[in-house]
Amino acid sequence: MQRRIAFSLLLLLPFASPALADSACPDWTAQRAAAELAALAERLRQWDVAYHRDGRSPVADELYDQARARLADWNRCFPGQADASPEPLAGSAGPLLHPVPHTGLAKLDEAAVRDWMATREDLWTQPKVDGVAVTLEYADGRLRRAISRGDGRHGQDWTARVRRLPALPRQLAERRRLILQGELYWRLPGHVQAEAGGRSARARVAGLLARDTLDDGDAAGIGLFVWDWPNGPADMRARLDGLERLGFAEARRYSRPVADFATARQWRERWYREPLPFASDGVVLRQGRRPPGERWRAEPPHWAVAWKYPLAQALAEVRAVRFRIGRSGRITPQLELQPVRLDDRQIRRVALGSLRRWRELDVRPGDQVAIRLAGQSIPQVDAVVWRAAERPALPSPDPAAHHALSCWRPLPGCEEQFLARLDWLGGRRGLDLRGVGRGTWEALLENGRLDDLLGWLELDEARLAELPGFGERSASLLAERFRAARRRPFPMWLRALGLPPAGEATLPPSWDELAGRGPEQWQREPGIGPGRARQLQAFFAHPEVQALRQRLRAAGVEGF
């Protein structure tokens, strides 16, 4: 149905709330609020013009709806700086007056749908076809006018283009004046919305109809779903029967009576996950009987509502950008978000994958990003939807300063990678020190007990018990874990220190033998090429690694 009707390092922003959905407001000055509200209002205006006038869809419909709801929230938060909410259909009206206004639909969530259905009878549901709305006016059995939805009252003249569509009967048996409202959609045989999403089908139709000419191939790709007959029979069954006789059969095929909420939910789920010949973005619930067309207005009515499918993309506000640095020096930017719900999951953070990706997107606190769930329900950033009016400078780590042989000590700028080394060392693929995690290492580091990767070897129960946050029992358990680490076998220690992968190479139980190997000797081992051979030699030759070896040798650890 119609698109634009909606009710709906660490650097932190000064936001007090986890989400606007909780009715909290940004902690902005009046000047900042005015700038942010004006910027969003202008962005919405640009999107409206692109869609309704130019036939382009620069942003997904569900993101548009969320952006409009965000502006409404901000206007409520800052009434003194509120920007007049842009009329979605401003600039889209054409010269032709609709014989019956297009109403649009209120979009309800599950709880609101339950309440709406509870007070009504004779209810029906249809797929909410994802296309562009149109009025068709027939007289003497022939199409007299086709009018774009426009602002609901006036629209553009699409008659010449719509007459070329094979989806419309060329001649009707009915001679009297007929007024039909429906959706022009792009044909997608076997389309499963839950798997394929909208596939920009709506934008494709809008773009084609914005052209001056329409070729035969494109015309054949456009279908028609008539969803109402304003001057037709008062009864829904009679309207569906009449439309089928006139040659508009899809309405009957995809209209179902619903006696209760469970049935409505069942059809919504079915149409979301089963093949349909078109894209759809939810279902429409409507009363079988509604007021006659002459009483309709260009605003959401009380007799029909939309219940959208689960969001494929969520609009999320970036609260912070954190740069995670792994033990090998890989830098992974991570966005901290105001929590958003997507497919029944609450998303609080999302990784960007690489420093290059972050630089390409140039994401900063305050920006609004589109989030979707990728394979295995992993959240990912699709795009920056719009940028904050005020964008603070955001320093980032230097990639040249972080690599496989950097940050063996907690020097300035090395804290993150050093902690990652400790985390690996004590983890399951390292020394497997059960109960010793990142929090333990952070506590020891904050108390000045870790000058290098093996500083913990010197900590006994008495020294640990002196530290804030360590009781007698926890100190005893941790000291036992540290003592047990000394007894771990040589290969386990090599992995824990960060030995580059050695494939199927035979590793003698002696540090001296391994450290004495050159690249040529390493390449004689199965699975080791020139690059890996150089990495292995560099590891054993690095001064910090050699210093760790001396610590372990002095501690009596096997193999060193």
Swiss-Prot record:
InterPro entries: DNA_ligase_B, DNAligase_adenylation, DNAligase_N, NA-bd_OB-fold, NAD_dep_DNA_ligaseB, NAD_DNA_ligase_OB, RuvA_2-like
GO molecular function: DNA ligase (NAD+) activity
Alphabetic keyword roster: DNA damage, DNA repair, DNA replication, Ligase, NAD
SMART domains named in the record: LIGANc
EC number: 6.5.1.2
Similarity-based family: Belongs to the NAD-dependent DNA ligase family. LigB subfamily.
Protein name: DNA ligase B
Organism of provenance: Azotobacter vinelandii (strain DJ / ATCC BAA-1303)
